[in-house]
Amino acid sequence: MYIGRCLDSILEQTYQNLEIIIIDDGSSDRTGDICEKYLLEDRRIKYFYQENRGQSVARNNGVLRCTGDWIAFLDSDDVYLPYSIEVMYNIQKATNADIVLTSIGNFNNTYNTSINSQYLKEIKLYTLEVALEEMYYGKTYGVSPLAKLYPRSNLLSNPYPEGKIHEDMDTTFKLISCASKIAVCDIVTAVVYFSDNSTTRTKFNERMLYFFEAIQNNIVFINLNFPHNTSLISAVIYNEVFGGIDICGKMIDFKLYDTVDYYRKKYRKYFKTILFNNRISVKEKVKYILFISSIRYFTIVRKIYNLRLSRNG
């Protein structure tokens, strides 16, 4: 069971002064039984059950239930490395930051289970504009709630939209914007495992369409507050286009060609912005050109890629 692996990673943290809130979102497997076992073994754990109301409600409920001033999220599929909370806590203390942003790793890679204080020399303090630009490109960190340390007060003021998929797209930029001091460190703290239920692997669901509304809210915010920052505008366009292409790929599987065609036409206007952006890889540019040029060839290449992905687990 993934939840056991997840909880073990939290209990093994080098920083022990934790309040551990589990929100069981209507699980139909043995999750409840497993959590009850952990509950008896560690007094720091608090367990709450909700009737399958979704990830956003679970996060919001966790924020409401906790009593600490700082919060880190972790999904049941994933794990924190043993030093993760200590690292984020130390970064916050060293910088007095209002948010701490670290990196997410992939389970296929190998990571050290211990760390020295060298990372404290690699902390960067970002302006809001730089922090948002880096978030949209997602190289060090992205919109995912994982591997971040948030003040509880900001999460209470900016709850996750309920009943949506890609709800973090509409929330993370607000949480970063709340911060007067933003600390970033390119150190992996969370490791993600892609199960069959992961958003990246699930089939199309109408709730995924919320991405387009959420990214539009980001665009409005950027254009309103930073209308002359062309590099930031290019970054949010990058996220809009490639996030949208991924969802359109899922829509193609359901033969929703009219909707896909709408976004193909819309994204064509970004041709120069995408092609002349040196932060976008050649592979991504080819993907973009295929998408706006031919649904047929885009679909063929996507199927080949997904086949290789499934073979590699």
List PLM regions with ranges:
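Short, well-formed alpha-helical segments that are part of the catalytic scaffolds
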Residues: 1-12
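Conserved short acidic donor-positioning loop in nucleotide-sugar-dependent glycosyltransferases
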Residues: 10, 25-26, 53, 76
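Catalytic core of nucleotide-sugar-dependent glycosyltransferases
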Residues: 189-195, 202-230, 241-274
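Glycine-rich, basic loop-to-helix element that forms the pyrophosphate-binding segment
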Residues: 50-66
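A conserved acidic beta->alpha catalytic loop
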Residues: 16, 24-33
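Donor-binding/catalytic cores of nucleotide-activated saccharide
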Residues: 55, 76-183, 193-206
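Short aromatic/hydrophobic "clamp" motif used to bind/position activated sugar donors
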Residues: 71
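Membrane-interface aromatic/basic loop that binds lipid-linked glycans or pyrophosphate carriers
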Residues: 252-313
